[in-house]
């Protein structure tokens, strides 16, 4: 019995150029997160969602304090209708 391609456990093989482009994009995202954390910038829920590449509603549903990769994301305060978040680098 043959398994269909891309079944659970299989990874889609992209051309090398596309994989390299994805890694470049990932590194740029991580650099941005690092700069946001290092400079103490506060960012909105929409900006956190953009950084993490998730739905904006998923940001607030995670709670007030949660890990993401090498950072902890914490809810700091509300300004008007915006919730502001802070990234803190963890080792």
Please place each PLM-identified region on the residue numbering.
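Long, charge-rich, low-complexity intrinsically disordered regions
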Residues: 1-35, 46, 57, 80, ...
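Polyanion-binding surface elements
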Residues: 36-54
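Major-groove DNA-recognition helix of helix-turn-helix-type DNA-binding domains
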Residues: 56-87
């Amino acid at each position: 019995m043959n398994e269909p391609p891309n079944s659970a456990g299989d990874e889609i093989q992209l051309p090398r150029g596309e994989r390299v482009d994805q890694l470049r994009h990932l590194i740029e995202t991580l650099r941005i997160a690092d700069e946001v954390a290092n400079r103490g910038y506060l960012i909105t829920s929409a900006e956190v969602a953009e950084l993490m590449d998730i739905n904006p509603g998923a940001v607030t549903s995670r709670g007030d304090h949660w890990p993401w990769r090498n950072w902890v994301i914490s809810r700091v305060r509300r300004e008007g209708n915006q919730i502001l978040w802070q990234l803190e680098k963890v080792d």
